[in-house]
C-alpha cells in the first residue's frame, strides 16, 4: 500500500559521510537511492522541474523530489 501525500511537506536531504540522510518531522533517516528520474514540464501556469528519488531506509520506503525551480526538497509518497 502507498500513501500519496496531498501536501508535499518540505524535508531536509544531506549527504553525510558517504550516506544520504533524509530529515522529516524531526527524524533523521539514512537512506539508499533505489531509482531516480527527472520530470520537466511547462504547464499553463507554472513550470515543473523536479528530480525524483525512490529511497529506502531502515523504517520506510519513500518517494522524494528536489524542486529545481524552488530549490527545495519534498516528500511526495510513503510506501508501506
Where are these regions (language model features)?
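Non-catalytic peripheral regions of nucleotide-handling enzymes
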Residues: 1-80
Amino acid at each position: 500500500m502507498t500513501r500519496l501525500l496531498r501536501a508535499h511537506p518540505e524535508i531536509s536531504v544531506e549527504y553525510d559521510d558517504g550516506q544520504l540522510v533524509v530529515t522529516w518531522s524531526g527524524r533523521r533517516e539514512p537512506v539508499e537511492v533505489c531509482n531516480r528520474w527527472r520530470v520537466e514540464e511547462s504547464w499553463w501556469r507554472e513550470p515543473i522541474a523536479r528530480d525524483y528519488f525512490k529511497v529506502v531506509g531502515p523504517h520506510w520506503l519513500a518517494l522524494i523530489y528536489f524542486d529545481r525551480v524552488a530549490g527545495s526538497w519534498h516528500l511526495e509518497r510513503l510506501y508501506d
